Amino acid sequence: MKPTVVSADVLFEDHRAALKWQWVAGLGASERRFDEVAVRAARSGADLVGYLNYIHPYRVQILGEREVAYLTNESPDDCARRISRIITLEPPVLVVADDQTAPDTLLSMCERAQLPMFATPESAAFVIDVLRAYLSKHFADRTSMHGVFMDILGMGVMITGESGLGKSELGLELISRGHGLVADDAVDLYRINQTTIEGRCPELLQNLLEVRGIGLLDIKAIFGETAVRRKMRLKMIVHLVRRETLERDYERIPYEPLTQDVLGIPVRKVIIQVEAGRNIAVLVEAAVRNAILQLRGINTYQEFVERHRKAMEQDD
C-alpha cells in the first residue's frame, strides 16, 4: 500500500527548522496536496521533487539561482509568460532557494492562484536532498510482517516461523550474544527505492520483546542503548520450521538460493529446522556469516560442486 497524501502545511512544518524557510505566498492553500495519480505513478518519492521542470509539473518545483535568473533575465513580457506557465501547471509547492528573492510577478501570481510558495536561504541542492529523503519515506510502498527483526553482524535479518517455535526466545539469545533488536512481533517494512527495504518498529512496541512465561521485556533498559536499533535494511529472512515441515516442503541442500518476495523485491531466505538440542542462535549466526561471504562472491556450495566435478573427472 502506498499513501498518497501530504499537504503543504505538513511539508512546511516538518522542515521549518531544517530548511529555515518562510511561507511567502499562497497561505490560503495549506491543504494543497500532491496529485494522487502522479504519486501512484512515481517510481519513488524522490521523483516528486526537483529543479524547475515544465515536463513534470506534479513535482515540488525548486527555483535556485539559475532558475530565478531564467525567469527574470528577459523582457517583462517574456518573464511574465514563463512565470504564468509555471502557475498554469499547478505544482503542489514552489520553493525559492539559494537565498534568492522571488520575483514580484511570481509572488503575485502565486497569491492569486493560491499556490504555496516557500523561500529558504539554503542551497537548492540541499533542499532537494532533504525533500527527496522525506518524500521517499512518506510515499514508500509499505507492509507489516510478523516476526523478530534483528541486526546480526550488521545485516538486517527477519526471523519468521510458525507460532510457538521460539522466535522471541531466539531473539533474546541473539541479543545476549551482542546483536541488536529492531522490532518484535510486528515489523513495519518500507520499500524506499527499487532495491531497498527498510524495517522499523511501530512506536507502540519500541524496544520491547515479548517472551512467553516472562512477559514484556524492555531490551534497552535491560541490555543498554547498544542492544536496540532504530531501523535496518532487510537483507535476509530466517524462517524457522518443524522437522516434518522441512522434510515435506524444502530440499535439504537447495541448488539455488531461496528468496522471498517482499514488496516486489526478492530477499534472501534461509530455512532452519527447530528441534530439541539444536543451538538455533549459532545456526542463525552461521547462516548470516555465510550470506556475507556470498555477497563477497564466495559461494561454498558452488565450490563444493566444482570439487566434486574435478574428483569425478580424476576417477574417470
Curated annotation (Swiss-Prot):
Region (Important for the catalytic mechanism of dephosphorylation) residue spans: 273-278
Reactions catalysed according to its record: [HPr protein]-L-serine + ATP = [HPr protein]-O-phospho-L-serine + ADP + H(+); [HPr protein]-O-phospho-L-serine + phosphate + H(+) = [HPr protein]-L-serine + diphosphate
InterPro entries associated with the record: HPr(Ser)_kin/Pase, Hpr_kin/Pase_C, Hpr_kin/Pase_Hpr_N, P-loop_NTPase, Ser_kin/Pase_Hpr-like_N_sf
EC number: 2.7.11.-, 2.7.4.-
Binding residue positions for ATP: 161-168
Domain remarks in the Swiss-Prot or TrEMBL record: The Walker A ATP-binding motif also binds Pi and PPi.
PANTHER family cross-referenced by the UniProt entry: HPR KINASE_PHOSPHORYLASE, PROTEIN YJDM-RELATED
UniProt name for this protein: HPr kinase/phosphorylase
